[in-house]
């Protein structure tokens, strides 16, 4: 069966002030794929993700997801279309508990309490370590656990596609393996992944 295109980026140009950061980038992400953007740091890969998820304005080009023009869509609305973004540097709410962090992930789009509880349960099944630490402040977790939490929080919105920016950044080789295992498991559950990664070897080992 032909895969359907979930996300299409066409002739994307992005400026930061006078700097032309993204130059005519086009890419297609088919449903069910893992697509990896590899390149030297500062090569604008993060900017591509930010532009796709509505955090940065494009100068020209098109970004469409299932027929929706993302360049004209609010970031909060993009989440409800089924896109979740795990930014680089493991952004967690450090003064909140693990569980509160997960609730924040759901809060943006859902006020349905039983639904949120079921989603949290799903995340805990995927990441038993987060369940063990659910009352702990996120800021006291290890780097690897914070990355798990960042992924878990993104999954709370039941995304069709997950954008991940440098998930291996600053983690030990052992944890990098663990994070990539997590990415593969998430992918097995039918979630499409667009990954920015400097660790080319790891990234290529899982990319389609």
What are these regions (language model features)?
Residues 61-69, 81, 115-120:
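Conserved ABC transporter NBD signature motif
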Residues 96, 141, 154-155:
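ABC ATPase signature
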Residues 38-40:
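The feature captures the beta-strand-to-loop junction immediately N-terminal to the Walker
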């Amino acid at each position: 069966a032909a895969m359907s295109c979930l996300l299409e980026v066409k002739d994307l140009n992005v400026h930061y002030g006078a700097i032309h950061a993204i130059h005519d980038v086009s890419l297609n992400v088919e449903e069910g794929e893992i697509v990896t953007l590899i390149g030297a740091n500062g090569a604008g890969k993060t900017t591509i993700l930010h532009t796709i998820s509505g955090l940065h304005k494009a100068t020209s080009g098109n970004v469409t997801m299932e027929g929706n023009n993302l360049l004209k869509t609010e970031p909060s609305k993009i989440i409800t279309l089924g896109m979740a973004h795990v930014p680089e540097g493991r952004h967690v709410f450090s003064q909140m508990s693990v569980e509160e962090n997960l609730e924040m992930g759901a809060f943006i789009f859902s006020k349905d309490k039983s639904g949120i509880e079921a989603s949290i349960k799903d995340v805990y099944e995927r990441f038993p370590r987060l369940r063990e630490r659910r009352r702990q402040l996120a800021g006291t977790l290890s780097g690897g656990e914070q990355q798990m939490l960042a992924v878990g929080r993104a999954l709370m919105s039941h995304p069709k596609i997950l954008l991940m920016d440098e998930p291996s950044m600053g983690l030990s080789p052992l944890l990098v393996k663990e994070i990539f295992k997590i990415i593969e498991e998430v992918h097995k559950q039918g979630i499409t992944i667009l990954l920015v990664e400097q660790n080319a070897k790891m990234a290529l080992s899982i990319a389609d």
